[in-house]
Structure formats: structure tokens, C-alpha cells
């Protein structure tokens, strides 16, 4: 079974379209780790594309605020303005769908493979707290110790990579891409006996100084995660943000990758 892992699309239609095009033929199921909306200028278009595809979606903090479930009191002024704009734009169907999203962590049905059953967890921030940012080994320590499955997929940080632990070994994962025609790719083997936190990165607003849209493919038979980076029409996405009169900073940071 191959899962296309999406996260932090943030209403960036151009980035999502580039990812879906690049991932054609690579997946059997789609898992969305949340923050599908917020910041970007195409919330309905993105939701209309994701809803029929995603087998499982967990909510993110922007999904909660943009749908009116949570207050924006902890958001910075730019994020707060974008969330209010998004709530005004959402169709009734998309608003209902966002409000119905489950809080992570959730576990998909166990996956039968030649090596036995495989269980994984999906969360937005962390398997312990949906709003936790896991950006360092210190952040990863408790989730790796306490999560209920050997592999947990998380988003929220907008940084592609992750962390793994086996016995007394602790490692941070940063992809070392093999580049071809602007598309970066790197495969991580999930070793027996390890516990893995896997972050596919952000599709719509990367913050690891690489502006390209990020996603991952999990192959349960091969026991691998392949990280991908794909270019997209940033100028068009920026133009949508400016046309919507959202803060200019939201457009500028797309090219900066931070």
C-alpha cells in the first residue's frame, strides 16, 4: 500500500496541483495532516480538490480557526486577518466539512503486508498534542517514547524531515535530495525496531528555505518514506493573494520558503 501524505496546503491551489500532478500513479490512498486552509487565497478550490481524494484528514489549528471552531487569539495579526477572510469565503459545504474534521491523533486501519500488519498514526502537530511543534530532538523525545505506533506522520512545522529512535540511538532526518529537472527526491528506509516521526513538509507554505511544494509517499510494503519537492507557479499563487487583498507578506514568503 502506498499513501500520499499531504500537509499544510494552506489554500495554495497552484502548489497542490503541482503535487497531485507529480504524484500521479504513486499512491493508493491519500492522508491529509491538516491546515488545508489559511494564509492562501484559494480555500474553496483546494477543499474541492482534496475532499474527494483524502481517505483520512485530521484537523489543523488553521482549520479550526478558519472554520470558527477556535478563537484566533493566539494567531499573529497576519494569520488572524487571513483566517477571518477565509471564513467569509468558505462555501457552506466546505465549512461543514472543516468543522467535522477529527482531532488527531488517529490511526488508519492496520495495513496487511508480506511482513505482517503495519500500524501508523496521523497527527497535525504531535501524537500527544495537536498544536505541538516538533522542531528539535528535545521536542521529539516524549512523542517518540509515548506514541502508540512505530510510525507517526505529523505536519505543522512546515519543515520536511523528521526524527527516529532505536534503543539508545536518536537521529534527526533531513532529506538529501537527488535533483532531476527541478524535482527533488530522497528515500528513507524505515528500519526494523525504530520509532519514526515523519513530517512530509508543507505543500503551500514551506519554511525550510526551499520554496518548492513538499510531500511524501509512504510505501508499507517496501518500508520506505520518499520525500519529494516539486516546483510550482509561485507567481500565480502570489497574484491570487494580492488580488484578494490579503497581507503582502503572505505572498512574499512563498518565494522565500520561510
Language model features: what each stretch is:
Residues 168-258:
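Acidic, His/Gly-rich catalytic cores of divalent-metal-dependent hydrolytic chemistry
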Residues 1-55:
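N-terminal active-site segment of His-dependent metallophosphoesterases
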